[in-house]
């Protein structure tokens, strides 16, 4: 019944505007078997399918709700017109407006000192739009590990992951620590190629036990802690470790440890591998743009709730955003930027950028024309730097 209602709802919403979406979405399946709209199929969506699909994950895939509480953490509006902010890219000068249009940005918000300095929506999005974050979920999982340590579920990052997930004993992840998993330095091979249907990222099972077995059967390429290799599969494995440690699902834990204590304004959702199953820890939390900004503020504040109570260990965010020994651009599922800034990044242009030194958070929801490239990422960082410079100059 639920799946039928969901299909009617999504088909009704889309029929009048984007007929090309009807075939892939109208055949979505909410049972325990494979989805005709498989997660990997998003890589073949066109621009219009992405702009609607990215705000409709709860209608297309199984999800679990992340529930907002009764109290919302306020964001004071103190706007500054940044639309004309200019930046240089490949010898040419562009404005922020140019960037938003050319890169199909659905929403951007700039917060400094708890004040909204700039907020803009496009692609039929608005403040209430719940948009998928893709790999931003990895950075959220990092913070949940901190919460689990504070709660006593995990003793520390030096623990072997087999302590919490004995099923991994004797396989590729034998001897890998929680810290090495968070730094993606397990030494286990993995192919994160979004255009290769035979790559590990495309072949990874959705069900959690087959996923664990797939990961532990992979060959080892390096000694743990000696080589960085970006792996969404490894983040899914981290989610399995976290679930085993806390004895709960990740969406509920996120609800009670961050979403409600920090005062998120709206319900979010987290994509599941199967109906009623485990969350994709490496992907696909959906939330409003302002709540993405609040996640950045929570991280920037070191993991303290709205009432001042501490959720994360005092040194957790500092450790999470410290350079890994063998890859200085990455911490505990966070990307590290210049000047002490750090970022949660998702494919197709999703971003939470945090600059603690200047108290700035920039969040973007986008539907880039491709999952990502050096050119798209380079231009994104150029515009982020220009925005930060303009906000600091005005402050």
Identify the function of each model-found stretch.
Residues 132, 151-189, 217, 246-282, ...:
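Active-site helix/loop module of the DD-peptidase/beta-lactamase fold
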Residues 83-99, 126-128, 137, 148-227:
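Active-site-proximal loop and beta-strand segments within enzyme catalytic domains
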Residues 121, 127-128, 195-276:
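Catalytic-site signature segments of enzymes, centered on catalytic residues
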Residues 234-241, 281-304, 350-367:
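Active-site-proximal alpha-helical segments within enzyme catalytic domains
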Residues 102-105, 129, 347-348:
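Short, small/polar residue-rich loop motifs at catalytic or cofactor-binding pockets
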Residues 265-267, 314-362:
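Active-site Gly/Thr loop motif
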Residues 114, 131-157, 181, 238-242, ...:
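Active-site SXXK
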Residues 10, 23-125, 151-154, 209, ...:
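N-terminal leader/targeting segments and the immediately adjacent pre-domain N-terminus
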């Amino acid at each position: 019944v639920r799946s039928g209602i969901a299909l009617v709802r999504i088909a009704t919403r889309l029929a009048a505007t984007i007929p090309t979406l009807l075939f892939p979405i109208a055949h979505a399946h909410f049972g325990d078997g494979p989805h005709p709209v498989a997660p990997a199929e998003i890589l073949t969506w066109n621009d219009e399918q992405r702009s609607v699909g990215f705000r409709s994950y709860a209608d297309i895939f199984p999800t679990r709700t992340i529930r907002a509480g009764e109290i919302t953490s306020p964001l004071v509006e103190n706007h500054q017109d940044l639309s004309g902010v200019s930046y240089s890219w490949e010898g040419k000068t562009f404005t922020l407006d140019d960037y938003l249009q050319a890169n199909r940005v659905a929403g951007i918000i700039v917060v400094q000192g708890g004040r909204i300095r700039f907020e803009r929506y496009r692609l039929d999005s608005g403040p209430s739009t719940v948009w998928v974050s893709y790999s931003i979920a990895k950075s959220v999982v990092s913070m949940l590990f901190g919460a689990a340590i504070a709660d006593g579920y995990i003793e520390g990052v030096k623990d072997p992951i087999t302590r919490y997930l004995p099923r991994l004993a004797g396989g590729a992840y034998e001897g890998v620590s929680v810290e090495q998993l968070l730094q993606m330095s397990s030494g286990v091979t993995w192919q994160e190629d979004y255009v290769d249907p035979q790559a590990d990222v495309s072949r990874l099972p959705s069900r959690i036990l087959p996923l664990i077995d797939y990961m532990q059967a992979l060959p080892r390429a390096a000694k743990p802690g000696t080589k960085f290799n970006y792996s969404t599969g490894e983040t899914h494995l981290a989610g399995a470790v976290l679930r085993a440690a806390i004895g709960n699902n990740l969406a509920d834990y996120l609800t009670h440890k961050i979403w409600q204590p920090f005062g998120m304004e709206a319900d979010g959702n987290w994509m599941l591998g199967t109906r009623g199953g485990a969350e994709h820890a490496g992907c696909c939390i959906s939330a409003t743009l302002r709540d993405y900004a609040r996640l950045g503020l929570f991280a920037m504040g070191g993991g303290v709730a709205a009432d001042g109570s501490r959720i994360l260990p005092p040194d957790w965010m500092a450790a999470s955003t410290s350079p890994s020994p063998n890859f200085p651009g990455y911490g505990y599922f966070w990307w590290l930027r210049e000047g002490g800034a750090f970022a949660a990044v998702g494919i197709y242009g999703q971003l939470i950028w945090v600059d603690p030194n200047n108290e700035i958070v920039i969040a973007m929801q986008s539907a880039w024309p491709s999952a990502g490239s050096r050119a798209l990422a380079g231009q994104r960082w150029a515009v982020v730097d220009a925005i930060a410079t303009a906000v600091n100059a005005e402050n």
